[in-house]
């Protein structure tokens, strides 16, 4: 679920036999947005790490800081807490396989938990998640599980509408610029075949949404 943003080596000279492509204004603006998002995500991560200790380890979001898709579940698992990274372990592997099956670029995805420690006050967690949503500015939020849907509803995010947890796999409107869809909790959908089927039936809507996304 991690992202890789490769930049050209500034010490590498351009070949004299090839014209150097001029960067467009749009590219430069996008680069500035990305640098700012990386800085803000890192700042949030530093704040969370400063609040942690040996017994309370924050689980930081992972993926592209300007991801089109924002994967969200309620609380971290032990494997995530051990590594300090959201969606580390079985859930992340299951989601990666699902994204690949649907043709969704994993590098366009950001994933996090509502609760960063699993033990913090809800008001703290709501403030941190609100910051993440403002930084990433996703086009689609995938809310995994009813507790996640309820938590989103408590954010009072600007111009947001309440999501219906009883409509799994349907596109809903979260804000005028952010779509949303509800799925079962991925952590509870890894073992029993019926649970796997229910998660996939809802999650595969992401593939249709992604295919219809304008390429610009």
Segments predicted by a language model, with ranges:
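A polyanion-binding, active-site-adjacent surface
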Residues: 2-216
């Amino acid at each position: 679920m991690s992202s890789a943003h490769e930049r050209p080596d500034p010490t590498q000279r351009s070949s004299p036999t090839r014209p150097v492509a001029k960067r467009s204004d749009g590219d430069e603006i996008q680069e500035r947005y990305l640098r700012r998002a990386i800085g803000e995500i890192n700042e949030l991560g530093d704040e969370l790490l400063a609040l942690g200790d040996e017994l309370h380890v924050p689980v930081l979001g992972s993926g592209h800081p300007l991801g089109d898709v924002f994967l969200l579940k309620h609380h971290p698992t032990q494997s995530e807490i051990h590594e300090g990274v959201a969606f580390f372990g079985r859930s992340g592997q299951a989601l990666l396989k699902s994204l690949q099956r649907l043709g969704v670029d994993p590098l366009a995805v950001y994933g996090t938990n509502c609760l960063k420690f699993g033990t913090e006050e809800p008001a703290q967690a709501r403030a941190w998640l609100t910051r993440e949503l403002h930084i990433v500015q996703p086009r689609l939020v995938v809310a995994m599980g009813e507790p996640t849907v309820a938590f989103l509803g408590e954010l009072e995010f600007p111009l947001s509408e309440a999501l219906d947890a009883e409509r799994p796999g349907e596109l809903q409107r979260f804000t005028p610029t952010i779509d949303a869809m509800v799925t079962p909790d991925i952590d509870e959908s890894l073992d029993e075949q019926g649970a796997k089927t229910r998660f996939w039936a809802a999650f595969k809507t992401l593939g249709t949404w992604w295919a219809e996304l304008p390429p610009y």
